[in-house]
Curated annotation (Swiss-Prot):
Residues in compartment: Cytoplasmic: 1-31
Topology feature Lumenal, residues: 55-417
Matching SUPFAM superfamilies: NAD(P)-binding Rossmann-fold domains
Cofactor: NAD(+)
Entry EC number(s): 5.1.3.5
Cited InterPro entries: NAD(P)-bd_dom (IPR016040), NAD(P)-bd_dom_sf (IPR036291), UDP_G4E (IPR005886)
Alphabetical list of PANTHER family matching this protein: UDP-ARABINOSE 4-EPIMERASE 2-RELATED, UDP-GLUCOSE 4-EPIMERASE
Gene3D superfamilies the record matches: NAD(P)-binding Rossmann-like Domain, UDP-galactose 4-epimerase, domain 1
Reactions mediated catalytically: UDP-beta-L-arabinopyranose = UDP-alpha-D-xylose
Primary enzyme class: isomerase
Protein family per UniProt: Belongs to the NAD(P)-dependent epimerase/dehydratase family.
Protein name: Putative UDP-arabinose 4-epimerase 2
Length: 417
């Protein structure tokens, strides 16, 4: 493309002397005039092309507002849960913008989504850090969002105790940036991804939405602080807010298109399902279960495991039910706990591998039982967990793991599904 601005500047700064022109020579004169005509013709053609170009003339489809809630910003949409949420939204005919800095997410997941939904105006990916307020403001300025699903966050309890400031910055501070920018640009719906870690060590089970929030680690504390900011802001705002506190997430897309692919350097902080799969694949020698003397059915900790497909369904239902000036807070779980021993046995059956297990002393800070009371979300959002067979959820996740041994490193659409 011609740099028209520079061409004009150069012509203005150059001294125009007529002494070198021989007007008495018609050949020289015609040659000079021909060059002028050629330059003028090329300039006119460039201007015409620029005016006709959709890049210059037509605004992006993502910058246009449409009736209703049609365009959703998914922060952290390249991550495990966020990518599954983006997939569901796209299947439900929403337009989706994913914003992710890829510190924990996978570009491969975005590429899969782009292959599945190649139509113009359906999906766009923007590489950005939510901690950069100027970048976030620019994104909101150039796009007409109807709602935000805010997943982006570091999310390992163990890591949060080692690097607490990282968690307060990434979760609490970044949520403040998102909320301020939403308010500045009139985006009126927020679906916030929170956690049962905000409850800490409840004295009574099951956990309801009224259970006191007394988090015991920086991850839970950072999430609760973010919740408090959102709730304080909502008191004098027309924003529709839904806060979903979910429990232990497992599983993967039933059609095998997406899965969980944490970075290897973070495996020590990862979910128990990841450790089980690593043991089944021989990446680690076996599992270490810490604590067999809890007051539970078999002495090991009891947790509520929610399939990612059900979790995403809860987010979509929350989006559909969100009302201006209203705040909804919901636990997202099955309402049933499974012990660590039960989980490991289900994983052995799902993988077909007799995983070696070592039993160690209990770890400080772990609590015996954590499971939800899902009655509120059932009554108000008409949501219930459907994928409650632990072995089946693990089997689906294992199938993806076997076909993607390097995660999304060599990801492609798998025809086996």
């Amino acid at each position: 493309m011609l740099n028209l601005g520079r061409a004009r500047t150069g012509r203005q700064n150059r001294s125009m002397s007529f002494e070198g022109l021989d007007f008495a020579d018609p050949k020289k004169n015609n040659n000079y005039m021909g060059k002028i005509v050629l330059v003028m013709t090329l300039t006119a053609m460039c201007i015409l092309l620029l005016n006709q170009s959709p890049t210059f003339n037509t605004p992006s489809v993502f910058s246009r507002s449409e009736p209703g809630v049609t365009h959703v910003l998914v922060t952290g949409g390249a991550g495990y849960i966020g990518s599954h949420a983006a997939l569901r939204l796209l299947k439900d005919s929403y337009r989706v913008t994913i914003v992710d800095n890829l510190s924990r997410g996978n570009l491969g997941a975005v590429k899969i989504l782009q292959q599945l939904f190649p139509e113009p105006g359906k999906l766009q990916f923007i590489y950005a850090d939510l901690g950069d307020a100027n970048a976030v403001n620019k994104i909101f300025s150039e796009n007409a969002f109807d709602a935000v699903m805010h997943f982006a966050a570091v999310a390992y309890v163990g890591e949060s105790t080692q690097f607490p400031l990282k968690y307060y910055h990434n979760i609490t501070s970044n949520t403040l940036v998102v909320l301020e920018t939403m308010a500045a640009h009139g985006v009126k719906t927020l679906i916030y991804s929170s956690t049962c870690a905000t409850y800490g060590e409840p004295e009574k089970m099951p956990i309801t939405e009224e259970t006191p929030q007394v988090p015991i680690n920086p991850y839970g504390k950072a999430k609760k602080m973010a919740e408090d900011i959102i709730l304080d802001f909502s008191k004098n705002s027309i924003m529709a807010v839904m806060i979903l506190r979910y429990f232990n997430v497992i599983g993967s897309d039933p059609e095998g298109r997406l899965g969980e692919a944490p970075r290897p350097e973070l495996s020590e902080h990862g979910r128990i399902s990841g450790a089980c799969f690593d043991a089944a694949r021989g990446i680690i020698p076996g599992l270490q279960i810490k604590g067999t003397d809890y007051k539970t059915v078999d002495g090991t900790c009891v947790r509520d495991y929610i399939d990612v497909t059900d979790l995403v369904d809860a987010h979509v239902k929350a989006l559909e039910k969100a009302k201006p000036r209203k705040v909804g807070i919901f636990n997202v779980g099955t309402g049933k706990g499974s012990s660590v021993k039960e989980f490991v046995e289900a994983c052995k059956k799902a993988t077909g591998v007799d995983i070696k297990v070592d039993y160690l002393e209990r770890r400080a800070g772990d609590y015996a039982e954590v499971y939800s009371d899902p009655r509120k979300i059932k009554e108000e959002l008409n949501w219930t967990a459907k994928h409650t067979n632990l072995q089946e959820s693990l089997k689906m996740a294992w199938r993806w793991q076997k076909l993607h041994r390097s995660g999304y490193g060599s990801s492609s659409l798998v025809s086996a599904y």
